[in-house]
């Protein structure tokens, strides 16, 4: 294999050390898909490497979106200002029932285009027609953990079909796209999957040695219904069903008590905090400071584009840093540096990736560059703070995944933006007319 070794010079790099951040001015050397050097000086012998000028740019680990439904970009704006169950039952599920694999392909393409251009280099997706999602991931060069989301409110025959689809997809695609695709087993939620069905999906995860992902405790109504149906709150319910016997990520986790936080910490369960979606659907505000204090890994997700309604991870970091200050009355809650960890390295851990999420030697070369020669970044007092409190997806200038540039000067190099915009509009129009 030919070695591709090159260097970014004259750049500013966000380097995390534990829970702290340093801004290093100097050089970063990339060899093939890995970061091999980062520091104030260039290693001896590397003077003749191909150089990328980092002047005016701030380099960060790629952002990681740990919960979403990419194809739902086709339903953006279709059902706003509604409570979760009304939104799902009256607006989303009837439309989703009509979606074809082609719809999923174009909806996912639209979302991946938005994510890449906005600095997201890895994401977790739970949906149907996941072979189409995987094709988009493979074509675009993004990194993804993918799950065929399974709803069990159906006949036993259909439950079995969905379970087999989930397992087949997971086997077929795990490790594909040069390792950029990993797979997950994903019952949709305790309120949409009977207990015995969740147990069967947990067994599939054991059989395939894969992690698990689900929605959990998103609304107070969901928690109360779980107690009424099963005599347990969702966390204890999932623990009883063996869900946490596999590496696990739960989305939302808004309504938790102290005992539930202890259970999540005991089993090393990660939480995907979705502040934008939770606010928009009036689901509530998760106890993120308490989760972090208990040692739970917390990351950030946008949820689907129909409940956010964008995929701007800078916005999620800023919301995470702001709302917990307002709710707790503590101005030190989720400081900027911690919010950036939620969007990067904690995200990698949450979606079971151990070689991305940080600018460090030996890590995958998944990183982004922000244009900081703009009014809202000045003065350059604290670039970590500016990233969380001032930046947006529109500030992303360049993006690399696996050492390959996928966005250059704000333009995606791996996707046909004009066609995606056209086809996604046609797909929605067709969906609405069915």
Predicted region positions:
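His/Asp/Glu-enriched, well-ordered alpha-helical/loop segment
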Residues: 240-247, 289-374, 388-391
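Active-site microenvironment of metallo-dependent hydrolases
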Residues: 1-26, 31-36, 341-434
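Helical hairpin unit composed of two closely spaced alpha helices linked by a short loop
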Residues: 280-282
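Metal-coordinating catalytic core of metallo-dependent amide/deamination hydrolases
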Residues: 132-254, 259
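Active-site gating loops and adjacent loop-to-helix segments of metal-dependent hydrolytic enzymes
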Residues: 74-106, 113, 140-155, 160, ...
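Divalent metal-coordination and catalytic microenvironments
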Residues: 11, 28, 33, 56, ...
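Alpha-helical scaffold segments that flank or form the walls of functional sites
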Residues: 76-142, 165-176, 424-433
